[in-house]
């Protein structure tokens, strides 16, 4: 049965979308529709996708969008999806043969599960990294969402999870956030959707470390405050405020590390102070101490260098 709606947000993805669609060809027997949200592309994304889908016999429908936001683009498709199961993948990632059918098989074997998570692999600069296996999840409940936000379980890559449309309901991705919008979406779902995992690899996703880090350097304070506001709305799911504070600290530490690496020590220090004030596990306490020491050393070196230059 064709039971899956595949959702692909795409912005200027003409160079990669045909490969993404080709990677889904082996799952054609279970795919009822592919909803490609062409989000303000200025290239031939839609035309390339339509040609590839016709050649691959995939049931593609293009949705024109001007969201300029991956979360918003996914939301448009979620509102129009017709199949009982939803699978989302980005327009530069690759599905692995048999992954979608394995996710569906686990949902059949564990009928209460409305969210099935598989393994994934990262690809950076052409290098394939070791598969990341899902671990630490319980069957259902807020415990999953809390552990996810606190970094105690494996993160879910978009493209490694299958979710029932019934479980999603009216849940949508937060929009206009520079980062972590998928984490907030998964957390909401995990609060109520019974979950199952498989160890089979489902997809490979491309990571640009530079592009990922850039998200934290543009208007860092403004973007962090917008993200924190969206994060704190998760209290309406019953998630404890202490868990949300822990997440704040994890993200603040990541931002501090990026600014430290790029030589912006003042911004790094400000975000490190936020990270230090948040509840954390011992390993993160050590990371904060280590970066505090490194900042002190680099600042002292910079002052000494400036004095020598002016002498």
Predicted regions mapped to residue ranges:
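Glycine-rich, basic loop-to-helix element that forms the pyrophosphate-binding segment
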Residues: 65-81
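Conserved nucleotide-sugar donor-binding catalytic segment
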Residues: 139-219
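Membrane-interface aromatic/basic loop that binds lipid-linked glycans or pyrophosphate carriers
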Residues: 260-311
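Short, well-formed alpha-helical segments that are part of the catalytic scaffolds
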Residues: 13-26
């Amino acid at each position: 049965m064709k039971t899956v709606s595949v959702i692909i947000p795409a912005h200027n993805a003409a160079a990669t979308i045909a490969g993404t669609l080709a990677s889904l060809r082996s799952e054609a027997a279970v795919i009822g529709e592919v909803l490609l949200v062409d989000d303000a592309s200025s290239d031939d994304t839609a035309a390339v996708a339509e040609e590839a889908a016709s050649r691959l016999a995939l049931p593609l429908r293009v949705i024109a969008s001007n969201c300029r936001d991956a979360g918003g683009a996914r939301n448009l498709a979620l509102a129009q999806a017709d199949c009982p199961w939803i699978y989302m993948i980005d327009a530069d990632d690759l599905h692995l043969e048999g992954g979608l059918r394995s996710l569906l098989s686990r949902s059949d074997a564990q009928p209460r599960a409305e969210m099935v998570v598989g393994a994934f692999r990262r690809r950076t600069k052409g290098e394939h990294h070791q598969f990341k296996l899902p671990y630490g999840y319980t069957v259902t409940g807020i415990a999953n969402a809390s552990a996810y936000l606190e970094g105690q379980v494996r993160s879910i890559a978009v493209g490694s999870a299958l979710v029932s449309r019934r479980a999603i309901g009216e849940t949508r991705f937060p929009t206009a956030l520079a980062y972590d919008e998928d984490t907030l979406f998964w957390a909401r779902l995990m609060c109520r959707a019974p979950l199952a995992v498989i160890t089979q690899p489902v997809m490979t996703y491309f990571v640009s470390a530079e592009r990922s880090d850039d998200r934290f350097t543009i208007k860092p304070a403004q973007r962090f405050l917008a993200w924190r506001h969206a994060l704190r709305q998760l209290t309406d799911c019953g998630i404890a405020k202490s868990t949300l504070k822990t997440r704040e600290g994890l993200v603040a530490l990541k931002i501090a590390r990026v600014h430290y690496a790029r030589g912006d020590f003042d911004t790094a220090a400000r975000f490190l102070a936020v990270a230090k004030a948040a509840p954390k596990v011992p390993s993160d306490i050590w990371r904060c101490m280590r970066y505090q020491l490194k900042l002190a050393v680099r600042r002292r070196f910079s002052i000494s260098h400036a004095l020598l230059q002016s002498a």
